[in-house]
A protein has these predicted regions:
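Short, well-structured N-terminal submotif of metal-dependent ribonuclease cores
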Residues: 1-41, 56-65
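Short beta-strand scaffold positions
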Residues: 6, 40-41, 80, 100-103, ...
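Alpha-helix capping/helix-boundary segments
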Residues: 10, 45, 84-85, 105, ...
């Protein structure tokens, strides 16, 4: 199966469906799923998704519904942030000057040799050498 790592910015755009990035997220991810692809996310993405959706809407139940939707998707697989991944993320955070959670997505992409889908411009610019980010056009 063709896989990619997807960060919270792309997940939120995909799940909410009405963000500025939603059309791009839908185009990329629906084409990926239609081609038999799957996505990998670190388990922290679940909390990031719930928080982003609930805060943006002001409705906690929408955040929880987004998590339920994510859990039911057969082509989305989570990975636990263990000591090894956390250590790699810490190294990336310090050397690339990226935020902590962003470093986790970059570390996962690097560790698994997978491309990363993100709408975070800084994260795309500061990705370590060898980490491919998926073009948005």
């Amino acid at each position: 199966m063709n896989l990619m790592v997807v960060d919270a910015s792309a997940l939120v755009a995909y799940v909410r469906g009405h963000d500025d990035w939603s059309p791009v997220a839908n185009r990329i991810l629906e084409a990926h799923f239609a081609a038999g692809g799957g996505i990998r996310i670190p388990n922290i993405a679940v909390a990031e998704l719930a928080s982003a959706v609930a805060r943006a809407s002001g409705q906690p139940e929408l955040g929880l519904q987004a998590v339920t939707h994510l859990a039911r998707h057969r082509r989305i697989v989570t990975r636990t942030v263990d000591h090894g991944l956390a250590s790699l993320a810490a190294d990336i955070a310090a050397t690339q000057l990226v935020r902590g959670c962003d470093a986790v997505y970059l570390a996962m992409a690097q560790d698994e040799g997978l491309p990363l889908l993100t709408f975070d411009h800084e994260q795309r610019l500061r990705a370590p050498e060898g980490v491919q980010t998926i073009p948005l056009d």
